[in-house]
Amino acid sequence: MWVTNSEHNVHIQLVNIINNLNLPYAVRNNGWSKITELNVTITNDRPSMRDEVRELCEYLINALVAVLETGKGLAVSVSFGKDSNCCLVLSLEAIKRFKRKYGYMPSCYVINSNTTIENPALDDYFNLMQQNLEVFINTHDLDVTFIEVHPDTTSHWHYVTLGRGKMPRYPGMTRDCSVDLKVKPIKKAKKALAKLTGELVSVVGTRMNESEERKQKMIERGDVANTVLTGEDGDLLILPICDWEVDDVWALLTYCDSSSENALYHSFAPSFDETIDIYRSANSGECALNVGDKGQSAACGARFGCIYCLVSGDKDKSLTAMIESDSERFSYLAGVNKLRDFMYAIRWDMDRRDWLGRSFDIETGFYPLQPVYFSFETRLELLRYMLTLDAQEREWANQFNSGIVRFELVNYQQLIEIDLAWGLYSASPHAFAALLEYHEIHNCGKRYEIGEIVTAPKLPIPAKRWIKLPAAQDISKKDKRHNRDGLSDPKLIEMARNAGIVIPTIKDLFTVHKKNCAVYKI
């Protein structure tokens, strides 16, 4: 607890504000600023908290310096959440000290994976953190490069869920989406960088106390702090804060306020007020500094992840809390939140599933019958809702914000990805159906509103059955696939030819022969 020898009433009140953990961080930090301006001498009669954090950090920084001394660079994976920010603070401090001591440094990287479906409310925050980082790197002349990576097209949520119809990740299902959207792109980038600059050690901010499930998995893998580990694929990694409590995380970020004489480190962000403010908003307005790992509210422990993530259950508590605690700032996300809740509600609605499988037994020619994918009608419905939300946001932007939108759920590239998947799997009744929906909603004024959400009752998934396709479908054993004409429609092609339109040709993916394809114009 901080104390002062001053008998001045204002000084005593300011010290009481600093010591009051129930007050928002911004209020307490403002108290620090005023105390500093007034040149009031204050001391901590229990300095152990700050000293413990410094001792903990120094141990980790020395471990990271030791990695650099082996000639290996650091590759820090960041989401700019509280844990990865801690790892970045520690890594940058280690890099600064190494360069100061030796006059050079191995090439290091800060890597962020843009899934393209993050919470739109965090866009400004991500941009601010990235700008702060790049200014810090240039100011200190560090050989550190910020790299933003993206998942492969076939892993994009729009292609996988709206295009192919693969079910989103619901509670109890594997989280392979996280691997496809974040882990794989980062690992791919690090392998490419290692070939150019030498071996890299990944700095990862996972902590055992985030959840019991996480803790068990980390123990089974043999994860320990401050030791260079070898992953399953041979990737070298170090987990600096794997044994930290959430209090340690918030303490470090709090003590990295460059405006305070009490700052532990002057890092890439002048302060982490923005980080704390975001977590507070997602925690129903309560100060994140007062919430621990055990017994914490769900929002503070929640991930600021994908806007359509359904793993957390029937509600995205983090997003809901942001909207409810600061409606003036985040109410524009209410429609997106409702879309997410709608997707959760239709999980067990078998009438929204596609029953016919997409692969067959080459020996027997039988196709599986089991409802494991969204039907085309459901995918089309979801796309219409998303495009409607985009159109409404654009209307607001044109009227109130100089045409600058706050989010875009479906961009042009994603439309093409959806149409590609619909064409490959013969889902839509005609070519470029997704582009047509975009045109009708954005240019012709059509709107599709999400109605009352009714949660379908849980049902067992019917057992897999098999069906033999009619002989007329002509299954080719040579090509091991069902013949499809794709974009080739003889009637449309002939009509276009009679109208004097030049007919384009494409090379068939399977026969390698050229063929005419239908002309489509919006």
Describe each model-derived feature in a short phrase:
Residues 2-75, 84-522:
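Nucleotide-activated chemistry modules centered on ATP-dependent adenylation/adenylyltransferase
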Residues 81:
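Catalytic cores of secreted/periplasmic lytic hydrolases that degrade extracellular macromolecules
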